[in-house]
A protein has these predicted regions:
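C-terminal motif of bacterial Sec signal peptides marking the signal peptidase cleavage site
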Residues: 16-19
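Generic short beta-strand segments
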Residues: 67-69, 92-97, 128
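Short acidic/polar inter-strand loop motif in beta-rich domains
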Residues: 97-101, 128-135
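Primarily secretory-pathway and cell-envelope proteins
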Residues: 23-89, 132-151
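A short tyrosine-centered beta-strand micro-motif
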Residues: 119-125
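An anionic, turn-rich surface loop/hairpin at beta-sheet edges
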Residues: 92-114
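Surface-exposed coil/turn segments at beta-strand junctions on protein surfaces, enriched
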Residues: 59, 84, 102-106, 116-118, ...
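Bacterial N-terminal signal peptides that target proteins for export
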Residues: 1-7
Length: 151
């Protein structure tokens, strides 16, 4: 009788364990780093609505390559700070230019976040404005463009 209860409990435990959704590894806090930060020159001939900002995510091994199109101050020079709490990634896009211009234009900018592992993530991007958090799944086949929504 005791043996059958142990076997039944073991069966239930294994079933529950197997049915859990796998989110991938949870990253250690602040284990990510940013590299290869670049931005284009002001693209004055590109017509872009102030509300049209996109984020393209591409996987390259443990590196998340990010391409952005966005509207910024004409003197914009990209600086990026990245941190994480578990699988929530916080990206702060800053203007490192000492020049303050009174105009705005469209820019292409990109950077890489190193230290990624396969799994489910939420990325929170902020800069000139705050955007709604974006959920995505990181895998070696990731290559997707998202429209960022203003929060």
């Amino acid at each position: 009788m005791k043996k059958s209860k142990v076997i039944a409990l073991l069966f239930v435990f294994i079933t529950l364990l197997a049915s859990c959704e796998k989110n991938g590894n949870i990253l250690p806090e602040n284990s990510l780093s940013v590299q290869n930060v670049k931005n284009s020159e002001c693209r004055p001939n590109v017509k872009s609505s102030d509300d049209e900002e996109t984020l393209r995510l591409v996987a390259k091994g443990d590196v998340l390559y990010i391409e952005r199109v966005g509207v910024q101050n004409c003197s914009f020079k990209l600086e990026v700070n990245v941190s994480n709490e578990g699988n929530t990634i916080y990206v702060k896009e800053l203007n490192a230019s000492p020049i303050i211009a009174s105009c705005f234009c469209c820019f292409d900018f990109s950077y890489e976040i190193k230290g990624m592992e396969p799994g489910k993530y939420v990325i929170c991007v902020s800069g000139r404005r705050e955007f709604k958090p974006l959920a995505f799944t990181y895998s070696t086949t990731l290559n997707k463009t998202y429209e960022l929504e203003i929060d």
